[in-house]
Amino acid sequence: MNFTGKNVVITGATRGIGFAIAEAFVQAGANVAICGTNEAAVNEAVEKLSAAGTKVIGRKINVAAAQDCENFIADTVKELGSVDVLVNNAGITKDNLTVRMTEDEWDAVINVNLKGTFLMSKAALKVMFKKRSGNIVNISSVVGEMGNAGQANYVASKAGIIGMTKTFAKEFGSRNVRVNAVAPGFVRTAMTDSLPEEVKAKALETVPLKRFAETQDIAKAVMFLASEDASYITGHVLAVNGGLYI
C-alpha cells in the first residue's frame, strides 16, 4: 500500500503494536506523528522511524487530557501540514477481579483507553472536517466482544471503543470521514514471549490458527482500513484474532 504524502497520527506508538503500526506507515511513505507518556521512549521511537526517510515527529502527552490532545494535533498540522489518518492505539491495563478492583484502577483504564480515544478523535476531527476528508482507526480488542474475567475495566473500555466507532461512523460519514476499528486477539510481544511455555500452550488451545498474531498482522489490518482499498468501509470492526472469537 502506498501512503506517500499522507500524514498519520498514532497514539501510544513507542513500542509494541503502536510502534509496528507507525513503522508500517513510514515504510509505505507516510509522514507520522507519534505520542507516548515517556519522553525518552518517544525520542527513541522517532529516531528509529526517521530512518525510513519520511517526516516523523513525537510528543510526550496524556491522551486523557484534552489540552494535550489539542496541542498534539496543532503541532502535527504545523509540522506535517495536516492530519489524514488517526490511529487511536494508546491503552493500558490494570487487571483485578471486580470485587477487588479499586476506583482508581477503573478510572485509570477508562480515562486512557476510552476517554483518550474520544478526546484525540475530537481534536483531529476539527482538521478532518475542515478539509472534508479523514480516516480514524481505533484499536479495540477481542475481549471487548467476548469479555474476560479480571478485566472489567479494560473490557468496558474496549467494548466502548466499538460502540464509539459505530457511532462516529454514522455521525461523520457525511463529512467524508470513515471510522473503523481493529479488534486483536492474542498478540506476540516481549511480554508474551516471556510467559512459561505451558501458559502459552494453554492460550493457543483456544486459537484455531494455533499461533499468536505478530504486531505486523495488526499493522496490516490498520493500513487496509486506512487505505483507499477500504473506501466504502466504515463502522466496521475487523477481527484479527486467529479464530479465537467467531
Model-assigned labels for residue ranges:
Residues 39, 60-72, 103, 216-217:
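The beta1-alpha1 cofactor-binding region of Rossmann-like NAD(H)/NADP(H)-dependent oxidoreductases
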Residues 97-98, 102-110, 192, 203:
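Substrate-binding pocket helix/loop in short-chain dehydrogenase/reductase
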Residues 181, 204-229, 233, 240-242:
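C-terminal helical subdomain
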Residues 141:
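Residue(s) in the substrate-gating loop at a strand-loop-helix junction
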Residues 7, 14-16, 38:
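Conserved glycine-rich cofactor-binding loop
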Residues 121, 157, 165:
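Active-site helix of classical SDR
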Residues 126, 170-174, 231:
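Alpha-helical segment proximal to the catalytic Tyr-Lys
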